[in-house]
Amino acid sequence: MEAQQALVASKDGDMATLERLFEAGALRPDITDDLGAGLVHHATRAGHLDCVKFLVQRAKLPGNQQAHNGATPVHDAAATGNLAELCWLVRDAGCGLQDQDASGVSPLHLAARFGHPALVEWLLREGHAATLETLEGALPLHHAAVSGDLTCLKLLTAAHSSGVNQRTCSGASPLYLACQEGHLHLAQFLVKDCGADVRLRALDGMSSLHAAAAHGHYSLVVWLVTFTDIGLTARDNEGATALHFAARGGHTPILDRLLLMGAPIMRDSWGGTPLHDAAENGHMECCQTLLSHHVDPFLRDEDGYTAIDLAEYHGHQDCAQFLREMSRPVRVLMTPPPPPFPPPPLLAAKLSLEEERRGDSGLKSPSSATLSPVWPAQPVPREPMACTAPLRVTTPDALQGPEVEARDSRAGLATLQLDGLPAGDLDMLVPTQDERGRPIPEWKRQVMVRKLQARLGADHPPEDQDQSQRQDSGPTAAEQATWRYSQTHQAILGPFGELLTEDDLVYLEKQINDLQLRRRCQEYESELGRLAAQLQALLPEPLVSITVNSHFLPRAPGLEDEEAPVLATELEASEEPGKAEPRGQPLPFWCSHIGRLVRSMSLLLKGMNGLAQGEEKPPSPVPQDLGKETIAGPSRSEAQREIQECGVSVRTLRGNFEFAPDLPCALNSGPCELGVRPGQCLRGCWSAPPQPRGDAMGGEPGPGDTEEASDSGISCEEAPSEAGAGPGLDLASLRKERIVMLFLGHWKKSAYTPALRTAACRTLEAQRARSRGPEAAGSPRPSSPQPSDGPRLGHLWQQRGIITHLLGTWKAIMAHVPARQLRRLSRRERGPLSPEQFLPHVDGAPVPYNSLSLDLFMLGYFQLLECDLPAEERKMRHLLCFEVFEHLGAHGWEAVRAFHKAVTDEVAAGRRAWTDGFEDIKARFFGSSQGPPWDVEPGRKLGLTPLGSLPHASLPGSGPEPAVPPRLGSDSQGSSFNSGDICGYIDRSFAFWKEKEAEMFNFGE
């Protein structure tokens, strides 16, 4: 209570209250506000010199006390323009003249920024350096240019004239800042009197004209274009001109004036016009101005969006409707256009004189009516339009086609219409002599004429010619369009440049052979059915049962894969007799053929081609004939293959992350201290539990194995604090970052590439292994899932279908996010980024954060982490993602989503920096219980529903992308999946990548 009274008294200059509090001993240096400003700060800001003297001299409060941002009372005096307080603090209170706060701002910077010329003059006279820079590289001259005070600017340029063209760390010069703030008189002074360079650009490529146009400073734009040599076609790094910036900001007068001054309509680097920018931001007047200058509203940017599309996407329905209405052609009555120059009669007269002069009376020439229409008989256009032709957008492409014809017509040249010429006119185009000067027989000439006639689309030969003459006239136009072999290209070329190479022909031949083979197989289908019926009638019932249910056949114990069937004869050749199953009487050789036939047909009909390797079966004993190194773990080549499939470089990641000299406990070879329960070390790390023995070749665990993956060497409560941790705990944070990068990188790569490419490669490898046949029968081969395992296999197919459908939905969603939205988010300077900002807008606004589903959250984070984030923010976002996915199984999606929101809100409000960590928030949401809270089967806690029927797009083999883009909203949350199922998949995937990280970063130790 007394502290609050002291602050109020200092602001109001209440000396009586201050004396009473001083006598009571209540005036202490620790009395500050929320920003760390003390009593002397508040008295100085208010301009109460007597209070300042009382607090410093009698209450003995420090005159140079710093707030949280490092500002002293001297900074407050300079900012508020209190010269008397500033003089006393510097001369009598022991404050420094050039004290800088945490940003490097000095009193001279603040005096110039807030336009106090008396303080600027006094500080310069007292010896304050005009060359002092802030951490951003700003001089006091830059701050004066922002303030707009001409006197301050003149004082500072006189003190430091060489700083006129000096730029800050972002590339801003004093002239750029003056134009950005709209100070015309300062810009004129800098250019005329100080010689400032108008061609200087910021780091993003923006010039002074761009800055003035972007902020709507009309007079400054006109002055720059009129009285400086700055160009109207100047572009920034993204190809935007001053028209783009004016349209983006909705500055219609500037837009109209620039167009009247001759500014061309140009596309930016991504194909956008100023109309795109105006429509995107809903500036209808700018759209109207651009349309009045004949900008084409149907132009598309590189994303395929028109201005109407962008207006609808951002929720500007009125602007979109206006663009639609203005784009419709309106029929109006028009008078006939004026005659061309020269007039048609004069043109016809000139042509006739030239014909007489040449003396070519025997050659029939085109009439004037064919070349140029006669003006009096010119018809009225059928559908005249109200708007003229759209203004052409400046592109580097050359003029083509109709534009060239229109230009020639305007120049008075008649366009030669070859398709309207009679056959006699084409006769002149065929020479009478060949290249050697020998005469060409007339019948050959006529053949050439008719070929040319057919090629140019002229009429057929006269009907009075007989059939033989027509046959001699050469091939028709349809015959001319056949494909031909080109010696130059060594390929077959089509009439439009189509290319058919030898490889294409080989592929087509193979396809034809496959079709022929399929036809022959269909012919034998009925015969196979008849033979199968005979076998069932002749053979005893148990034998039929044995051939269908191949688990009754002897097989190699411990190996369960799907690559090839296990035959009885093969087992007899490779195993001892005692290794067979207890049922184990060896069957005759011919039974193996029946088993192979039934199994091959089952695989063919069921479609089981290598996708059932995720069968969740307990590990079986490893065959004794395998080497010990196979049992101990994967070979080096096998591990390297798996690492390549992960898409990461282990050595690079380790070099980037592991800087500390010590290794974590999970990687140490020595045992932990005695007395600690298994799995935990005294240093706080949770070691990896013994992993179950899997495939003898050390392959990756299948989809079923990941469900029971345990916490691999790290717990969610591993470190009490990220800030100020020791080397061991820093390594724990690095492990968290690695896990998150592997986890998110895997999902991102799967979403941005063809779905499940690795599984397809494995399927191809399995098919090749099966095609090798008997030569691989010497070693025990794992068996495929039997046809009787259909329900479990269908469950695996259903899981695969859900993931495929999820990835396809992600691709469909990202296809509807304009690239300009992602670019502008990546350049955003203020406020923290959030995943929903990177998703398609719903009704013109981003998706509400509280309605985000887990899959949309991940999709947004993929793009968020692509932005150019500061190093500390990127690190803490990785750690934040780790906590989100780590606690997903135990607390549910709603809880971890609220936790993420709480952390980002704290940072956005300025109450917390990224480097401060978030352990207190984590304890508030998830508690502070020690030990790994990981559940072996987190799906049970989530209450996962049984897998139901999938949408059509999610079935394997169908296209992963839905035909209609999903609509994001709070009702469906942009997802057609069960929320619990998706959380279960993501949770188990995160557990798998924790295991994978432990395996990968233990490689080669």
Swiss-Prot record:
SMART domains attached to this UniProt entry: ANK (SM00248)
Region (Disordered) location: 355-383, 458-480, 611-643, 692-729, 764-794, 951-975
Keywords linked to the UniProt accession: Actin-binding, ANK repeat, Cell projection, Coiled coil, Hearing, Repeat
Tissue expression: Expressed in inner ear hair cells. Expressed in utricle hair bundles (at protein level). Expressed in choclea (at protein level).
Keyword Nucleotidyltransferase: no
Any single GO BP term: sensory perception of sound
Top-rank taxon, per record: Eukaryota
GO molecular function, one term: actin filament binding
Basic and acidic residues bias spans: 458-469
GO CC aspect terms: cytosol; stereocilium tip
Listed transmembrane segments: none
InterPro entries per UniProt: Ankyrin_rpt, Ankyrin_rpt-contain_sf, Espin/Espin-like
Pfam families for this protein: Ank_2, Ank_4
PANTHER family noted in UniProt: ESPIN, ESPIN-LIKE PROTEIN
Quaternary assembly: Interacts with MYO3A (via C-terminus). Interacts with MYO3B (via C-terminus).
Job description of the protein: Binds to but does not cross-link actin. Required for the formation and maintenance of inner ear hair cell stereocilia and staircase formation. Essential for normal hearing.
Full protein name: Espin-like protein
Species, as recorded: Mus musculus
Lineage start: Eukaryota, Metazoa, Chordata, Craniata, Vertebrata
Encoding gene per record: Espnl
